[in-house]
């Protein structure tokens, strides 16, 4: 599917923003300012447009989860408790947000393993590094999502659109889709008090799959070196 440079640039800007928000929501618990500006008045506004990508059910699920949360007396603190339960405890009862926890054949790969080293290689190849105040290994889910935001934004001005699209699709398949479905499954099994984070995980998986399909369509037969 050929795109004009204007269409590609617009898509890149929109995609970068979405990946940036997903990265932020997994990097840390929702702050009070973010809760007030993006959760307190309804569904999560930055993701509303994803319903147009055949993700209406996932968006509606997230909106319903946020509505249930908002009925609580201290909703942001409840959400923070769910964040801790899901992402900060041991792997037996939570959904660890690290690729190394899911990429082994037996589901018991050591943390800081090959997946973490591979993500550091991706960062180095892109001339990027993890922010000093983010004290997590490189295979934390927020890292490839943040890198994808950078790639989508930087490639919006690329002259060779098919090659840029193919490179991004290859990165998503290798660094994200290789383990994201298993992480999403664990999020559903962990059963936190509210459905916000399980719903968010399902929406993320649907978005990444839709984005890869879009990039493959744009990239066509372009080779990725």
Which ranges hold each PLM region?
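Surface/interface-facing alpha-helical segments and adjacent flexible terminal/loop regions used
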Residues: 1-225
